[in-house]
Swiss-Prot record:
In plastids the minimal PEP RNA polymerase catalytic core is composed of four subunits: alpha, beta, beta', and beta''. When a (nuclear-encoded) sigma factor is associated with the core the holoenzyme is formed, which can initiate transcription. GO terms for molecular function: DNA binding; DNA-directed RNA polymerase activity; ribonucleoside binding. The keyword Cytoplasm does not apply. GO terms for biological process: DNA-templated transcription. The gene is rpoB. The keyword Nucleotidyltransferase applies. It is found in: Plastid, Chloroplast. Its main location: plastid. This is DNA-directed RNA polymerase subunit beta. It comes from the Eukaryota. PROSITE patterns: RNA_POL_BETA. It catalyses: RNA(n) + a ribonucleoside 5'-triphosphate = RNA(n+1) + diphosphate.
């Protein structure tokens, strides 16, 4: 909440609000708009007519709950019913029925959809807004060339360009261009009408040659010329109706449909008054665009900034779902048309219900959620990740850009992003700047523009009014950007404030200010707003921090941060992770899996999440926070979820840290930790892995789930029950059988036993053999079985196989190789775990928990971690929690430093520990070496920052290979952990070994351990018998492969082996 001196109050909007508003807009408006477009369908003889009555459409409440949909791998959807009528024109009879159109996936309370049991989210896309844009580019001679680009609603483009002779051309394809006169004439105007509707008729007449007059002599000639240039067809095409239809379909429908937004933009840019419902490009638009282009050539008018947000539009979840619904209705129209014709051909009497099938709508949405680039699997690593994922905005996707073609200018921060798109939070790598995050207060307007709130400053009225402005409106106001404290307390007349005006940042007098920003977090996304003292960090490190907070693993024992920003509670509540009371009442029963609440004559049972797996294998679990018999109010937290404590976000731990070098173990961002973090389960987390197997019906018969698996040791089958499925609560190790399965197969004659052959010869009995295809626990999967699910799809055919899933819980302590990070981009890998007695200790005898490298601070310029570190120490000693808003220097100079030093001073005073704040080196203290007891030479910064354990864990990455598979072509080990691959000794590694002269090791690496087949086979025998390994006498397989490839190019390569005894060259064929 934000209060100001004038009594104005503003609430931070719900972080899922953009998703909810988009889906509601689709249900309320989008469905009806598309249904109204559904045409009346007639048969060929025009005797029967089918139509939908849109006014009576209804969505039915889902038949299953969200939790059941996830558990059974179903889609959480609603059935759509519409009234449809079949009219017989001869008798004027009409049959009306309620028709089931299909299933529409619904949005749940998290702003996500559940499709086939998987949480999916649709992210917002930023596209170029349809309309016309003028720009200037230098050609190869250094002369400015002016162009006007008309962008359609579907992304198609028509470019108008003016050459040095002031002739205007329309570029209809990459290579071909035609005269503006031919295009206007093809669209239906004659020469007289063209000259009457332009401002510069003499320029148009100046490039009208005899050849041009012939082309625009009639509309047919103009269409033929246009068709010839557009399709690049030679010869002389003949005018026909089919030619007009083809041109209409390929050009005018794809490149000339502006849509409602495009029509508004065209009218505004070209000063036209064409009705808004006329959404196609008209000849009048083309001529007005040409007039403006001529004006640009003569220095009149302004060029457009293509990267300004006023020239962009947001394609939200509503637009994407509506597009898919329209596509499904087109498919349904084709189905109905074909069914009517088929019924009449077979002399059947159709009914509305028989004509319509639900398949087009259901399959369209399933393919959209499963295959569309903007529909993504919800990242559920922690509560913050769930919230941030739904607020992403992407330039990528259909109709947008690609990571390889986007320019630096598009990726860069634009002044119009202020208060709308976060300047910090973006992805790292090839998509940097293309995938951003919406700011906290940004919202999407009705025409797809991003709006940001401001307070209006009025001299007449003392009331504060909040305005939401689109990017094209706030350019014309003087907006005060800083010094919010002075603005709240009533500004003096002579005050000078920083402000923003027309994409420039200025310093102006207070009287000129018309609007002001009202919230410190207004410019940042959620991830960046959770970084305390963000103003003291370099932007690159803040970017890393906002990304790494989304990678934090929920810990078994979470802890609230001592130093925060105040947004932690709202992030946790909006994520849906904690259980919140929807009504007030009294707790009458609590359990580990449910809470029963009674009040006002009703009783509500609230189920809790128990050991649920997220798609990143983290554990989602809720713990009861209320006691039986207590009265609670609406909105109170009943149970904490993963990474929440008391309804606040808790991603990490407050750990005692020292910034100092220690025997080189924290070189290059390595981190030294105490064994206390392991033994006391400080950074212990739970992970749930899912393993599944399917049973199919093969050509030899159905696969069987059984515990009777031949040729396997009993030890591997010890955890199976009588059905062949692993028992709940079993502890399983690598290689154990989780599901016993046999697949029937037809064996070869030679593999039959003698008694089987006798049975076949005498009785004709076909003996089938089965192959063992059990589900085995892979490497690194050891743990406790907590759930087994047997999912049987409807139908039971071979296309709907039965699926068995086994869920295994792992407990992971922190270990060497795990990645930890702070909230300022300070990340590192655990390099060594020291005994507590060897860790450096403070003057009160307490050992530190972590040792960071101090050299990681000055070069990275993330000084915010030092402020947080010292303030966290003061907070832990004083038992206080701090919530620090960003840019607190707006209150006074050096506000952050003053706050930290004053709290440290008070902590030292109250705890009678003078070492907490030493005036000679404030924030630093003398500490002692735990091994010797001697003090270190220099005072060291110590404190309690908030440190996170990230999902990049060594248990998921470490891999070793003793034996494994080889590639068939090169005979070298496969690549990657998943394939049990090995590391390849490449060209540069060979150079390094050559540099040390290790010839024997080099020979082993390139022959026995790699791709020399014969030598590889001889190694085992010679090792067992104790003989020396013979040296290979021929070339390895990769060299033979090179020779074969050269042979395919008609090049014969021969090689020679030099004898060690007499160095005679023995010539040998490859």
């Amino acid at each position: 909440m934000l209060g100001d001196g004038n009594g104005g109050m503003s609430t931070i909007p719900g972080f899922n609000q953009i998703q909810f508003e988009g889906f509601c807009r689709f249900i309320d408006q989008g469905l009806a708009e598309e249904l109204y477009k559904f045409p009346k369908i007639e048969d060929r003889d025009q005797e029967i007519e089918f139509q939908l009555f849109v006014e009576t459409y209804q969505l039915v409440e889902p038949s299953i709950k969200e939790r059941d949909a996830v558990y059974e791998s179903l889609t959480y959807s609603s059935e759509l019913y519409v009234s449809g009528g079949l009219i017989w024109k001869n008798s004027r009879d009409m049959q009306e029925q309620t028709i089931f159109i299909g299933n529409i996936p619904l949005m749940n309370s998290l702003g996500t959809s559940i499709v086939n049991g998987i949480y999916r989210i649709v992210i917002n896309q930023i596209l170029q807004s349809p309309g016309i844009y003028y720009r200037s580019e230098l050609n190869h001679n250094g002369i400015s060339v002016y162009t006007g680009t008309i962008i359609s609603d579907w992304g198609g483009r028509v470019e108008l360009e003016i050459d040095k002779k002031a002739r205007i051309w329309a570029r209809v394809s990459r290579k071909q261009k035609i005269s503006i006169l031919v295009l206007s004439s093809a669209m239906g105007l004659n020469l007289r009408e063209i000259l009457e509707n332009v401002c510069y008729p003499e320029i148009f007449l100046s490039f009208l040659s005899d050849k041009e007059k012939k082309k625009i002599g009639s509309r047919e000639n103009a269409i033929l010329e246009f068709y010839q240039q557009f399709t690049c067809v030679g010869g002389g095409p003949v005018f026909s109706e089919s030619l007009c239809k083809e041109l209409q379909k390929k050009f005018f429908q794809q490149r000339c449909e502006l849509g409602r937004i495009g029509r508004l933009n065209m009218n505004q840019r070209l000063n036209l008054d064409i009705p808004h419902n006329n959404t196609f490009l008209l000849p009048r638009d083309i001529l007005a665009a040409a007039d403006h282009l001529i004006g640009m050539k003569f220095g009149m008018g302004t060029l457009d900034d293509m990267n300004h947000l006023k020239n962009k539009r947001i394609r939200s979840v509503a637009d994407l779902l509506q597009d898919q619904f329209g596509l499904a209705l087109i498919r349904l129209e084709n189905v109905v048309r074909g069914t009517i014709c088929g019924a009449i051909r077979h002399k059947l009497i159709p009914t509305p219900q028989n004509l319509v099938t639900s398949t087009p709508l259901t399959t369209t949405y399933e393919s959209f959620f499963g295959l569309h680039p903007l529909s993504q699997v919800l990242d559920r690593t922690n509560p913050l990740t769930q919230i941030v994922h739904g607020r992403k905005s992407s330039y990528l996707g259909p109709g947008g850009l690609t990571g390889r073609t986007a320019s630096f200018r598009i990726r860069d921060i634009h002044p119009s992003h202020y208060g709308r798109i976060c300047p910090i939070d973006t992805s790292e790598g090839i998509n940097v700047g293309l995938i951003g995050s919406l700011t906290i207060h940004a919202k999407i307007g009705h025409l797809g523009s991003l709006e940001s709130p401001f307070y209006e400053i009025s001299a007449r009225s003392k009331k504060v009014r909040m305005l939401y402005l689109s990017p094209n409106r706030d350019e014309y106001y003087m907006i005060a950007a800083g010094n919010c404290l002075a603005l709240n307390r009533g500004a003096r007349e002579e005050q000078v404030v920083p402000a923003r005006y027309r994409q420039e940042f200025l310093t102006i007098a207070w009287e000129q200010v018309r609007l002001r920003s009202f919230f410190p977090f207004q410019y940042f996304s959620i991830g960046a707003s959770l970084i305390p003292f963000i103003e003291h960090n370099d932007a690159n490190r803040a970017l890393m921090s906002s990304n790494m907070q989304r990678q934090a693993v929920p810990l078994a024992r979470s802890e609230k941060c001592i130093v925060g920003t105040g947004l932690e509670r709202q992030v946790a509540l909006d994520s849906g992770v904690p259980a919140i009371a929807e009504h007030e009442g009294k707790i009458i029963y609590t359990d580990i899996d449910k809470i029963i609440l009674s009040g006002n004559g009703y009783t509500v049972s609230i189920p809790l999440v128990m050991y649920q797996r997220s798609n990143k294998n983290t554990c989602m679990h809720q713990k009861t926070q209320v006691q039986r018999g207590k009265c609670i109010k609406r909105g109170q937290v009943l149970a904490d979820g993963a990474a929440t404590v008391g309804g606040e976000l808790a991603l990490g731990k407050n750990i005692l840290v020292a910034y100092m070098p220690w025997e080189g173990y924290n070189f290059e961002d390595a981190v030294l930790i105490s064994e206390r973090l392991v033994y006391e389960d400080v950074y212990t987390s739970f992970h749930i892995r899912k393993y599944e197997i399917q049973t199919h019906v093969t050509s030899q018969g159905p696969e069987r789930i059984t515990n009777e698996i031949p040729h396997l040791e009993a030890h591997l089958l010890r955890n199976l029950d009588k059905n062949g499925i692993v028992m709940l609560g079993s502890w399983v190790e690598t290689g154990d059988i989780l599901i016993g399965k046999l697949t029937p197969q037809l064996a070869k004659e030679s593999s039959y036993a003698p008694e089987d052959r006798l049975l076949r010869a005498i009785l004709g009995i076909q003996v089938s053999t089965s192959k063992e295809t059990c589900l085995k626990l892979p490497t690194g999967g050891r743990g406790r079985v907590i759930d087994v699910r047997w999912i049987q799809k409807k139908g039971g055919s071979s296309y709907n196989p039965e699926t068995i899933r086994v869920y295994i819980l792992q407990k992971r302590e922190i270990k060497v190789g795990d990645k930890v990070a702070g909230r300022h981009g300070n990340k590192g890998i655990i390099s060594k775990i020291l005994p507590r007695q060897d860790m450096p200790y403070l003057q009160d005898g307490g050992p530190v928990d972590m040792v960071f490298n101090p050299l990681g601070v000055p070069s990275r310029m993330n000084v915010g971690q030092i402020f947080e570190c010292s303030l966290g120490l003061a907070g832990s000693l004083l038992a206080r929690h701090y919530r620090v808003a960003p840019f607190d220097e707006r209150y006074e100079q050096e506000a952050s430093r003053k706050l930290v030093f004053s709290e440290l001073y008070e902590a030292g005073k109250q705890t009678a520990n003078p070492w907490v704040f030493e005036p000679e080196c404030p924030g630093k203290s003398r500490i002692f070496d735990g091994r010797t007891g001697d003090p270190f030479e220099q005072p060291v910064i110590i404190g309690k920052p908030y440190i996170l354990k990230l999902i990049h864990q060594v248990a998921d990455k470490i891999h070793g290979r003793s034996s494994g598979h080889y590639a068939l072509v090169t005979q070298q080990p496969l690549r990657g952990r998943a394939k049990q691959g090995g590391q390849r000794v490449g060209e540069m590694e060979v150079w390094a070994l050559e540099g040390f002269g290790v010839s024997h090791i080099l020979q082993e690496m390139l022959t026995y351990k790699s791709d020399h087949i014969r030598a590889r086979q001889e190694v085992l025998g010679t090792t067992i018998s104790g003989r020396t390994i013979p040296k290979p006498e021929d070339a390895p397989e990769s060299f033979r492969l090179l020779v074969r490839e050269l042979r395919s190019l008609a090049l014969e390569l021969k090689h020679f082996l030099i004898s060690e005894k007499n160095f005679q060259i023995n010539r040998k064929e490859v």
